């Protein structure tokens, strides 16, 4: 199969993509979070093609993307008042809400669960495609399972060339990490996966917001997309350090000395880079100022893809505190590091 990257976002081209989606093909589409691998969310056979392209287990739930809030009504049994508040506050945007599914939604979309994950993206091109397709689009991240999520069309192509017919190129994703996934219950809102909408933002509009136990315990059964299996791993082994730039630079130097002749790659803040640049040789990416979770989120996956291309032996990263958007970034970084994070 030849994979075509669509860069001219004309109505005719978007119609072509929508037609392909509606009739069972898998297409990579842009969102504000990461690129998604889209298929008709009401067609179990089409969703099987997503799992085949990603090499992803079919018991992992998918998110159904819709162009507007009205579109979710046939997909759910009910919309609780708390969910309505969240929709008004954060849609379109990087918030996925799980609700009791209707019989219209195939079990294939939910991984066999009785709740469906729904999101309205804050991305004009994506919503145009959704409108034209006329069906909800199931779309996990458009990468081979276990690899870093893509925030550019080129990163999608590197993983999906020959596996899907089309990639819609709308430039780099503005947020850079996946959506927040929440479950709405009578007693409050549970964050199943941290993402672009923070706990603090949710608490501004609803009461009783908490994190799901699975985020800190691997013994709990996951209820959200992207939380069951290994994710986000670069090719080279990766370690991360969190602390002030001086301590991070010292920790980096100790590891670099241990690695001796091996080639390293370093994801760091501007302040840490200034402390290392004259003495350390390797592949650097500076994401922004120390503690800037927004900048790190934007650059994280893109940088991991770049480091994969550089054929390095190991990766060292400077993390941020687990507050605000930092919770989502560090969740992804911890997975990329296989848990090898040191707080200095």
What are these model-predicted stretches?
Residues 1-344:
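Active-site-adjacent structural elements in enzyme catalytic cores
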